[in-house]
Amino acid sequence: MQCPHCHHNSSRVVDSRPTDGGRAIRRRRECENCGFRFTTFERVEQTPLLVIKKNGTREEFNREKILKGLIRAAEKRPVTMEQMQSIVDSVENQLRAIGENEVSSQAIGEFVMSKLADVDDVAYIRFASVYRQFKDMSVFMQELQDMMKKEKTKK
């Protein structure tokens, strides 16, 4: 495995353990050249999942795009990387469980928001504001009110 730090082609596995309910293997590696430690994940390769974007174009599903959006939404919030990875895993599992090779970006956004709402309200609102592209303050306020109603019914 190539080192992300020095790009040397040799590393050794320091630790290896199952993760994601046994569907993946997490490996902790150390570069034999510079000693840099990094983590890799090994998963079974799935059939490609295509995302139908709002403009009708299609692109391959990319877990990293969701993770980057979550990281941005959860900035300076008490949301761990593990929680965000878990959301991405859960969303991907939901998409694959549907059994379709193509899924709309809208469906992906809704899945992400439903999971994020259970983790952190502020991160949810941040994600929703970008995803739903609120046009004005009234739409934003309506989303907050809807969220507050759901919160009251939980208690």
Swiss-Prot record:
Short name of any one Pfam family annotated for the protein: ATP-cone
Keywords assigned: ATP-binding, DNA-binding, Metal-binding, Nucleotide-binding, Repressor, Transcription, Transcription regulation, Zinc, Zinc-finger
Repressor keyword on record: yes
Chain segments annotated as transmembrane: none
GO MF annotation list: ATP binding; DNA binding; zinc ion binding
Residues in the signal sequence: none
Chain segments carrying region Disordered: 1-21
Biased composition (Basic residues): 1-10
Swiss-Prot/TrEMBL GO biological process terms: negative regulation of DNA-templated transcription
Cofactor(s) listed: Zn(2+)
InterPro entries xrefs: ATP-cone_dom, NrdR-like_N, RNR_NrdR-like
Cofactor note: Binds 1 zinc ion.
Zinc finger regions, unnamed: 3-34
Domain ATP-cone: 49-139
The keyword Glycoprotein appears for this protein: no
Function: Negatively regulates transcription of bacterial ribonucleotide reductase nrd genes and operons by binding to NrdR-boxes.
Family per record: Belongs to the NrdR family.
UniProt-recorded name of the protein: Transcriptional repressor NrdR
Organism: Lacticaseibacillus paracasei (strain ATCC 334 / BCRC 17002 / CCUG 31169 / CIP 107868 / KCTC 3260 / NRRL B-441)
Gene: nrdR
